[in-house]
């Protein structure tokens, strides 16, 4: 083979390699651009268009060099380098999308379980040994019937039900020896635990069935203002578990005026409970046992607004975010010692890490205004977190923050909406002005509870003038006033 033919053969090989490299580059870069535009990534200051232009420029230069058989070694270097950059970028974007999507993964359903329970020392070990159970069919009949149908199907056992007024009443009957077995819905267990902290050691579950409940799709907002329901639970198990909501904050956001209003509704507020609560009055925290939809609809009815999205968080693990942010600073207006952690908080500005923050937001018994003061402290910590999260520095660490909290937070806000908010903040800069308010009322012990009809519970009867003032403030922010 002559030198000319060798050069010709080498040139054909290099062109073939370059064509293959160009095809790989176009495939990777095309998929990368698809994700960038689909999820609105880099959609500020035209960075997504700049990225597109760079991709097309590299592709065009590579194509022209191949066609005109110029600088073949440089072409190989250019395409290999571009493939590496595209691969790394694509991996980062896919990781980011995957992490964020996990926050949405369980947003369309909630989980709970229903069990048949007997006394811990009972000789009964299987539901086939039973002929009847005690359960509150008047307040939770649908779930009870689901369990009975499952037992009949899987265990070939048909159980009759002795009526009780509530799950708490059923538990009392079991402990008193008036019944051999009860049905127990997991979402009501913390209600029993509030009166009988050692209840779990007194019983054993001989049959358990898990269920899921569909959650309503988000009411997507195309306006510059919207409402987010922030629900704080403090429970074991997955974030998708149904549980009482001890923190109930309505976050009203106006992107035009850069205002955020946090409205705290005390957990003991006496309100008509929507959905599973049959619009019967009870304390707000009990709405959570019927699912997050019930809490949302209850607050929508109370304040006369639409709630577009929700964020549900396990408060204990969520506060770990504070350590990622380097702690937060809040103003404490009364000296107190928290039961959790025995932390002492003086009057004035205090710097909190995650453990101190947990003690700060949990305490209510040492505070002058009890649960309302606790709600105000929760607001202070959330405001402090929001102020750090909306800083440019925090947005740069967005992926790290989400990665650490994916098992602690559940939200139905789509990734595209999240990215629109991030892009708008990066585009405009500045900080949001955050204000807060709380619904006020009078404490009473004589109001009936739909979920716990046999108990005398502390309730907060809502003050009508306070409700009117709170509703007006929410509307002002929504309307940009």
Predicted regions and their residues:
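Juxtamembrane helix-break-helix junctions at the cytosolic face
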Residues: 62-71, 83
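Hydrophobic alpha-helical transmembrane segments in integral membrane proteins
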Residues: 89-106
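Terminal targeting segments of Actinobacterial cell-envelope proteins
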Residues: 1-12
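Internal/C-terminal transmembrane anchor helices
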Residues: 72-94
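Non-catalytic, solvent-exposed segments at the cell envelope interface
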Residues: 104-112, 118-120, 126, 131-481
């Amino acid at each position: 083979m002559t030198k000319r033919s060798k050069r010709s053969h080498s040139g054909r090989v290099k062109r073939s390699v370059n064509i293959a490299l160009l095809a790989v580059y176009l495939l990777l870069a095309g998929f990368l651009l698809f994700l960038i535009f689909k999820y609105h990534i880099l959609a500020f200051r035209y960075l997504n268009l700049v990225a597109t232009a760079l991709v097309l420029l590299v592709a065009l230069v590579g194509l022209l060099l191949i066609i005109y058989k110029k600088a073949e070694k440089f072409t190989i270097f250019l395409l290999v380098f571009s493939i590496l950059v595209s691969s790394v970028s694509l991996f980062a974007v896919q990781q980011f999308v995957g992490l964020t999507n996990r926050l949405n993964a369980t947003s369309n359903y909630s989980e709970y379980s229903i069990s048949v329970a007997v006394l811990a020392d009972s000789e009964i070990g299987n539901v086939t040994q039973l002929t009847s159970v005690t359960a509150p069919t008047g307040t939770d009949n649908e779930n009870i019937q689901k369990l009975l149908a499952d037992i009949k199907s899987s265990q070939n056992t048909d159980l009759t039900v002795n009526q009780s007024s509530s799950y708490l009443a059923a538990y009392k009957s079991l402990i008193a020896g008036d019944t051999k077995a009860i049905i127990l819905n997991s979402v009501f267990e913390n209600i029993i635990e509030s009166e009988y902290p050692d209840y779990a050691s007194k019983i054993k579950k001989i049959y358990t069935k898990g269920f899921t409940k569909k959650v309503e799709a988000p009411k997507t907002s195309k306006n510059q203002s919207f409402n987010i329901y922030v629900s704080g639970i403090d429970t074991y198990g997955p974030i998708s578990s149904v549980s009482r909501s001890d923190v109930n904050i309505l976050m009203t956001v106006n992107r035009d005026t850069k205002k955020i209003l946090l409205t705290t509704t005390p957990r003991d507020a006496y309100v008509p409970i929507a959905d599973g609560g049959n619009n019967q009055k009870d304390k707000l925290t009990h709405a959570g046992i019927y699912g997050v939809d019930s809490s949302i609809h209850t607050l929508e009815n109370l304040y006369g607004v639409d709630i577009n999205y929700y964020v549900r968080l396990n408060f204990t693990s969520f506060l770990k975010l504070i350590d990622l942010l380097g702690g937060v600073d809040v103003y404490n207006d009364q000296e107190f010692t928290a039961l959790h952690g025995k932390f002492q908080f003086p009057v004035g500005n205090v710097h909190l890490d995650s453990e101190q923050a947990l003690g700060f937001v949990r305490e209510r018994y040492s505070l002058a205004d009890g649960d309302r003061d606790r709600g105000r402290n929760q607001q202070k910590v959330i405001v402090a977190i929001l102020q750090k999260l909306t800083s440019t520095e925090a947005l740069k660490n967005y992926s790290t923050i989400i990665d650490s909290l994916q098992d602690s937070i559940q939200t139905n806000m789509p990734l595209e909406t999240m990215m629109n908010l991030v892009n708008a903040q990066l585009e405009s800069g500045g900080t949001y002005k955050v204000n807060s308010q709380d619904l006020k009322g009078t404490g009473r012990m004589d109001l009936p509870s739909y979920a716990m009809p046999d108990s005398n519970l502390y309730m907060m009867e809502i003050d009508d003038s306070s409700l009117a003032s709170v509703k007006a403030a929410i509307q002002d922010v929504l309307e940009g006033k």
